[in-house]
């Protein structure tokens, strides 16, 4: 199922690029766009995780005695997973994400703010949540979706510019390109929403079962949501990568359109589902 989603995303990216190439440069533009899309697909599959980590200035954590490393190692062994690479993000806004392409090539990144704010039980809940994403192969889809959304934003900007000068180009259709420039960002949001919402519920449940302590994750989610709603955002946060985090970095921004295309379930709903899981785990 996850492989099918990956193929769909990469294929859709290729189609978008080819369409843009044809609209802008006819047959020659289409061929050039196809080659560019193939290169981007290769890059997205093998290197998109490193691009995201680099974007957030993530630093490899090799200190085996550090609480984040120690907890990750303990939970990884319990989940019967290979040890992922562990990164610290030098930012005091509490948040975390997982990235990579499979169990063998995976990484967990947490901000310094997360480590400073949460107690050990809460930290276990967050890290278990990210390991659940790794276990269920959500990480490849999420990371590719981030690169894909960024590419769509770039294409939309190019189309807006092309639409302005399109009357001077024989093969361009400025009206079509302007329409696409409007629709493409919406398509990116829908893809991010589809990728993320249901997977967050599954990762929450997986974390609760792995730790045996839903309360730890509940408490962590509440703290992270309250902090996000205070208006603080992680440095370099982008809408294209927002779906990767355990809490959307932009959840503090009030927007009707933003609520419609929300990448995460509401934190209240997530906490309520974890509450329901408590009684099941007590049995």
Swiss-Prot record:
Enzyme class: hydrolase
Predominant localisation class: membrane
Record's GO cellular component terms: plasma membrane
Enzyme Commission number: 3.4.24.-
Biological process annotations from GO: proteolysis
A Pfam family the protein falls into: Peptidase_M48
Subcellular location: Cell inner membrane
NCBIfam families (UniProt xref): PRK03001.1
HAMAP family documented for this protein: Pept_M48_protease_HtpX
Bound cofactor: record note: Binds 1 zinc ion per subunit.
Cofactor: Zn(2+)
Protein name according to UniProt: Protease HtpX homolog
Annotated membrane topology: Multi-pass membrane protein
The organism of origin for this protein: Aliarcobacter butzleri (strain RM4018) (Arcobacter butzleri)
GO molecular function terms noted in the UniProt entry: metalloendopeptidase activity; zinc ion binding
Keywords: Cell inner membrane, Cell membrane, Hydrolase, Membrane, Metal-binding, Metalloprotease, Protease, Transmembrane, Transmembrane helix, Zinc
Sites where the protein binds Zn(2+): 129, 133, 200
Membrane-traversing stretches: 6-26, 27-47, 139-159, 175-195
PANTHER family: PROTEASE HTPX
Active site as annotated: 130
Family note: Belongs to the peptidase M48B family.
């Amino acid at each position: 199922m996850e492989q099918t989603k990956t193929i769909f995303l990469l294929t859709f990216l290729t189609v978008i690029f080819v369409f843009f190439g044809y609209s802008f440069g006819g047959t020659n533009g289409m061929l050039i766009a196809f080659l560019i899309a193939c290169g981007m697909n290769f890059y997205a599959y093998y290197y998109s995780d490193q691009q995201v980590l680099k974007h957030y200035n993530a630093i490899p954590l090799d200190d085996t005695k550090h609480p984040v490393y120690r907890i990750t190692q303990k939970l990884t062994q319990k989940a019967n997973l290979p040890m992922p690479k562990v990164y610290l993000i030098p930012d005091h806004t509490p948040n975390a994400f997982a990235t990579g392409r499979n169990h063998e090539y995976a990484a967990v990144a947490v901000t310094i703010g997360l480590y400073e704010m949460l107690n050990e039980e809460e930290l276990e809940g967050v890290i278990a949540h990210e390991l659940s994403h790794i276990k269920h192969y959500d990480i490849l889809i999420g990371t590719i979706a981030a690169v894909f959304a960024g590419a769509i934003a770039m294409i939309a900007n190019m189309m807006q510019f092309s639409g302005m000068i399109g009357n001077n180009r024989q093969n361009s259709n400025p009206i079509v390109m302007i329409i696409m420039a409007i629709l493409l960002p919406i398509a990116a949001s829908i893809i991010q929403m589809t990728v993320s919402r249901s997977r967050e519920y599954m990762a929450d449940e997986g974390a609760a079962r792995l730790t045996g302590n839903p309360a730890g994750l509940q408490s962590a989610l509440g703290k992270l949501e309250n902090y996000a709603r205070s208006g603080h955002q992680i440095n370099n946060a982008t809408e294209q990568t927002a779906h990767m985090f355990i809490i959307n970095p932009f959840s503090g921004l009030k927007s009707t359109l933003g609520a419609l295309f929300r990448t995460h379930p509401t934190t209240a709903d997530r906490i309520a589902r974890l509450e329901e899981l408590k009684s099941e785990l007590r049995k």
